[in-house]
Every structure is written in structure tokens, then in C-alpha cells.
Amino acid sequence: MAKKSTPMEEALWKSADKLRGSVEPAEYKHVVLSLFFLKFASDKFETQRRMIAQKHGEKFIDIIAFYTKDNVFYLPAASRWSYIMENAKQDDIALKIDTALYTIEKANPALKGALPDNYYSRLGIDTSKLASLLDEINRINTDDSENDIIGRVYEYFLGKFALAEGKGKGEFYTPKCIVNLIAELIEPYDGTLYDPCCGSGGMFVQSLKFVETHSGNKRKVSIYGQEYTSTTFKLAKMNLAIRGISANLGETAANTFTNDQHKDLKADYIMANPPFNQKEWRADDELTDDPRWSGYEVPPTSNANYGWILNIVSKLSQNGVAGFLLANGALSDDGTELKIRRRLIENNLVEAIIILPRNLFYTTDISVTLWILNRNKKARDVEKNGETIRYRGREREILFMDLRQMGSPFEKKYVELTESDRAKVAATYHAWQRDGHGDAYRNIPEFCYSASFDEVAEKGFTLVPSRYIEFINRDETLDFDTKMKSLQAELQGLLSEEEKSKADLLEVFRELGYEIKV
């Protein structure tokens, strides 16, 4: 079971919940996290200010360079937490908070576009409720850097907000266990890391934690990302700033397809959780000759899944690796998607397809797929975190894995992949990749199977793992996609018959002079 949150975190959440009735629940995160950022930045500023005074004297305490050199934001007087708390009970406290955030952003170019603009004044929150929230945030000791209290609280809130918002919301957040799994598989120790739909920046945060955990050097990782939603773009910038992580998220929040902020980027690692089954993502005559589709069919307007895949492929460097999530339908879609999928397989880009357990996500209860693409599946030696890894040639092979039997209960109806679950998956994947895999890897019924190109071609280039992995349990070996398509066709026929019968009945009544209006 997941560990329970600390009383401090719970108290902060309950304080945020007091906003109920004043603002929409979907706004909680923006109200709370911006204030939390203000408290954090102010505490760091005051600590640095005291250190400068002790080392260099009072006359240097307002020289901005003495702050920025240590990744500390310089705060003008009206932006400091002490000033906010002195005025917490005043009727114009919302305006003072807006002014504080504005002046911080103006004084620190790295925060351009990160903080909300005139936000608290527009919300019109009751002064007493806002003061209560400020009091709760004021109790947080942000000096506890050893235990990463800042990151922990921020992460707790992002997850809690995603849980509270539930289906159809919370797209800004990918559960930590999934991000950790992707990082453990693609191992982004050094080079360029890119996320084309970065949400609140969780992929970046967990990737750098992975590097730290394995005694790597975070400075060797350059981060690039893009986010479409303006409020989530700001969340990402704050989330990264809180941890002192430098990142290029583009000039502004923007649509990755129509306003690519990193057109010439070639990334060594790509991690992504794109919106599932995004419809009408481009107009019929839009992006038809986009260079990202070069060598492939143009992805259909009805579903963006393969648009995301080809965007990712176009960004991979010569030895680039990508790990991203998609709805299961992308494994076996027909028509244009099948043509694109076949070409991806023929081009030796698909490395692994991993079905995840249901109920991992806060936004959907369906099972989703983790895709691993690799630009270079040839035999070679690679230096990773000070160790030389010898990879075998895997050009005409794809590893299929099924994790639906994994996961432990988490937050009532959800599950999470445990550390031991992730370790098993990563060990299996890396054993399959590496030289001498015949001794370390084997196909395991109901878990994994290494399929040849010929096997995949024989099955019509479907990437549904259950078509390859051996299942003893007959329910698991059921071709879910084929069954669902059959049911879909049957239901469509029944609905068509119903519509015809309804039309015939209405016509009879009309002819009798008793027209029924529907």
C-alpha cells in the first residue's frame, strides 16, 4: 500500500478544500501552488540574503547577481512572504498577491510566463478563506531540503488534484510509478530529453530523480518540452523552478502540431503521455505536407494517436529512444493507421510494446499501452553512467509484455506499479536487449514474448501483445480488439435497424394524420 501523507500535507490539502464554494475544484491547484511557490521562493531568498550579508556585508544584499548565481530568485520587497503575511487579513490581499507574483516574474527572466497574471483579484475569494490558506502555507518549513519537502508537497498536491478531478480532468499529471517505469526502461542518463506534451513537467522531474538515484550527473541532461494549455504550462514552469531544474519549454504555451516550439530538435530521449484518441486535431486540409510525416501516410483527422507517434519519430536522434503512452486501440487500428504502423515496424523502430494494468490513471480506468521506440536497434557498445553496455542486434524483433497481473491497491480504486514490479519489467527488458540474452532472457507465458518480424507480418502487423504472448488463462488470450470490433459492428447494425423501424412507425402515424414530433 502507498504510504499515507504526513499531517502537514493533509492539513494543507484540507485548507485548500476550504476554498470549496469560493472557486471551482479545478482551480484549487492554481490557487494553492502559486502561493506555495511564493512561500518557497521567499524562504530561499531570505536564506540567501542572510548568507550574503554574513559573507560580503549589507551593501551587497540587493545585488541580483548574488542570488541568480546560486539559482535563487531575487524578490523585490512587495514580493516577499513576510509582506504578504503582514497584510493577510487586509481586504486587498488578493491584489497584493497578484502584485507579488508579477514583480517576481518581472525581476527574474527565467520565470517569464510561469506565474499567474492578475489571478487572485479575478477569483474574488473571500478574504477570511484566503487568509486561512496563507496561515496553513506559512507553517511549512521549506528549509528541509534534505528530505525534499518542497518537491514532496508539490508532487503530493499535483497527484491529489488529479485524483480529485478524476475522469476527463487531471491530464496535467502522469502517476509517478508510470514515469519511473519509463525512465527505468529508457535510462536517460545524459543527452537531450524531450516531452512534446509535458503537462506539469512530471516526466522531467522523475527522470532527473532517476539519474540522481543511480549516482548520475543531472547537469548532463538537457530538457526540452512543450505544453498546449496555458495554466498547465505555468504549472510546469513553477514545478521545475521549485526544484532548480532548467528547461526550454518554448516561448509560450502552444499546440505541438500547429506551432512546434522545437522544430529542429533531435532528442536522445523522449518521454510522453499524449491525450488519448484526440479527435479533430487538425483540419482536413491542414498539415497534409508536414515534414514530420515524411515517409509515412498523413495521420487521419479522426484520431491524433499516430500524429503523436510520427511527431516523436521525427524528433529522435540517430540513437534516440522514446517511451510514451497511448490508448490500446493504436495497436490494431486499420486503414491509414495500419499503413503507418506497418512502416514503423518495417523501419525497425518498434522495440517493445507493454500493456499496463487497468486503473493506473486518474483520468481513465482503461488499460493503456507503453510503446518503446528505438532509432538504433543494431549491435553496439554504449556507455551508460560510467558502464559499457553491449547491445545485441534486435532489428527484426519486438518484445511484447503484459503487466495486467501486476500492481498493488492505491487510493481506494486505483493501483500502482510497485518498485519490485518495475524492477522485474526493467530487468526483463534489459536482458532481452543485451548481448548474451539467451542466458538471461526467456519467453514467459502470460508475461513476455520476443516476436520476430515474420511473426508480426503473419498476424497482419497488429501489435496487440495477446496475439503473441502465450496465455494459460483463456480469458487473457481473448483478442479483445477483434471482439470489440465485432460487437461494435453488431451494435451498429442493431441501431440502424432501430432507426429504420422508428422512421417507419413515424411515417405510419403521419399518414394517419397524427404526426409525432421528436
Model regions and ranges:
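Non-catalytic, mostly N-terminal accessory regions of nucleic-acid modification and defense proteins
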Residues: 1-189, 248-261, 355-358, 382-388, ...
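Conserved Class I SAM-dependent methyltransferase catalytic core
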Residues: 11, 18, 27-40, 233, ...
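Short, contiguous acidic/charged loop-to-helix segments that flank catalytic cores in large enzymes
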Residues: 22, 281-303, 328-336, 357-363, ...
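Conserved S-adenosyl-L-methionine
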Residues: 168-272, 277-287, 292-296, 327-328, ...
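Feature representing long, continuous alpha-helical segments
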Residues: 205, 234, 272-274, 306-310, ...
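Short, surface-exposed amphipathic charged segments that create phosphate/polyanion-binding patches used
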Residues: 266-268, 366-373, 414-420
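Accessory, often C-terminal, charged low-complexity segments
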Residues: 276-298, 305, 338, 343-346, ...
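Extended hydrophobic-aromatic, low-complexity segments
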Residues: 279-283, 323-324, 333-337, 353, ...
